[in-house]
């Protein structure tokens, strides 16, 4: 938008996905850094990723292409960022990346969950089912007890919020699932 008259200069992004947050506007390089979700087909649309794009809408670049829920922390000069990502059923990974193209500078850490597994922790089961319309994907997880017996019956807690643009199903790794 033109800040003086409020008119649209050009649309920067478009598509069937959501810009969640504008993280930084680099006026000198004419680039915007932002987080978004819903851009990867056949993937849970609530998984957050980070992107950069030029003011004119060209050069859209995914900085965090690895499958997962991402959390990026940028350096003060915005040349690098630490990307920590995971899924409800996959342990966190931390990597250092450069911010221009998202290239990996170096891996930092991968969580070791062997002690959790030894203690009986079971990863949640991620699933996708069709909604009532037969077309809409509904993503969720099944969390089973550590001492799960498939021959027993268990109570089920179904926690659902069917509103737009929000989710309450854990998307990232939580050791207490």
Regions found by a protein language model. Give the residues of each.
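Repeated scaffold domains used in trafficking and secretory/extracellular systems
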Residues: 19-24, 69-73
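A flexible loop/linker signature enriched in serine peptidases of the S9 family
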Residues: 1, 13-20, 36-49, 65-67, ...
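A short beta-strand motif characteristic of beta-propeller blades
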Residues: 8-13, 59-64
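Serine-hydrolase catalytic core recognition
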Residues: 29, 62-64, 69-177
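Long, ordered, helix-rich scaffold segments
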Residues: 6-9, 22-24
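Repeat-blade elements of multi-bladed beta-propeller folds
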Residues: 26-35
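Short loop/turn segments that connect beta-strands within beta-propeller blades
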Residues: 3-6, 54-58, 99-101
């Amino acid at each position: 938008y033109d800040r003086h008259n409020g008119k649209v200069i050009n649309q920067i992004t478009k598509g069937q996905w959501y810009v969640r947050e504008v993280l930084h506007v680099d006026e000198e390089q004419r680039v915007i850094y932002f987080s978004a979700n819903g851009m990867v087909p056949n993937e849970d649309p609530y998984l957050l990723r980070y992107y950069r794009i030029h003011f004119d809408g060209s050069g859209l670049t995914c900085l965090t292409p690895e499958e997962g829920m991402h959390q990026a922390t940028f350096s003060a000069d915005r040349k690098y960022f630490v990307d920590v990502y995971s899924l409800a059923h996959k342990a966190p990974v931390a990597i250092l990346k450069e911010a221009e193209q998202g290239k990996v500078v170096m891996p930092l850490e991968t969580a070791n969950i062997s002690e959790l597994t030894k203690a009986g922790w079971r990863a949640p089961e991620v699933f996708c089912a069709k909604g009532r319309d037969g077309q809409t994907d509904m993503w969720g997880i099944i969390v089973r007890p550590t001492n799960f017996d498939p021959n027993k019956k268990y109570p089920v807690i179904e926690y659902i919020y069917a509103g737009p643009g929000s989710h309450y199903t854990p998307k990232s790794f939580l050791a207490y699932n």
